[in-house]
C-alpha cells in the first residue's frame, strides 16, 4: 500500500514520493531517512526531534490534500479552513480557521466533510504559511 504522506522538518517539506526517502514507523515513533548514494541513510526528520511533523494524505484520489493544509472553500462566500483529522469520527474535515485556533489540536473537530465541500483550493499549510491563520478572531 502506497500511502501519501509528507513531513515538515521545521524548515522544509518532504513528500513521500520524493526520491530516496523512506519512512520507518515503530509503535508511535517515526523517522524519515534519505538514502545518499548507497551509503548509510541520513536521518531527515523524526518524531523525537521536537520540531518535525508527520502529516497523512486524506486518501481522496481526486484531491491532493494533507492534514494541516489551509484551503479556501465555499461556493459564494469563500473562507479559509484547515484540513484536520478528527480522531473521534475517524475522518478528515475542513475546519474553519477560528475553530482550528480555538481547539489547538485536541483531536475532535467541528468542521465540514471534505467530500461535501466543493469547490476548494489549497492555498498553503499551517507550517509554511501561518500568516493565513491570522485575522480569524
Spans of model-derived segments:
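Secondary-structure transition motif
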Residues: 1-137
Amino acid at each position: 500500500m502506497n500511502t501519501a504522506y509528507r513531513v515538515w522538518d521545521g524548515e522544509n517539506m518532504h513528500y513521500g514520493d520524493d526520491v530516496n526517502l523512506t519512512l520507518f514507523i515503530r509503535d508511535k515513533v517515526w523517522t524519515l531517512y534519505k538514502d545518499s548514494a548507497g551509503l548509510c541513510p541520513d536521518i531527515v526528520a523524526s518524531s523525537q526531534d521536537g520540531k518535525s511533523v508527520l502529516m497523512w494524505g486524506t486518501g481522496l484520489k481526486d484531491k491532493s490534500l494533507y492534514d494541516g493544509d489551509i484551503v479556501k472553500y465555499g461556493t459564494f462566500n469563500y473562507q479559509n479552513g484547515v484540513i484536520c483529522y478528527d480522531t473521534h469520527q475517524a475522518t478528515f474535515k475542513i475546519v474553519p480557521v477560528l475553530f482550528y485556533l480555538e481547539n489547538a489540536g485536541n483531536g475532535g473537530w467541528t468542521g465540514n466533510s471534505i467530500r461535501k465541500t466543493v469547490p476548494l483550493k489549497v492555498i498553503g499549510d499551517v507550517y509554511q504559511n501561518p500568516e493565513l491563520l491570522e485575522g480569524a478572531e
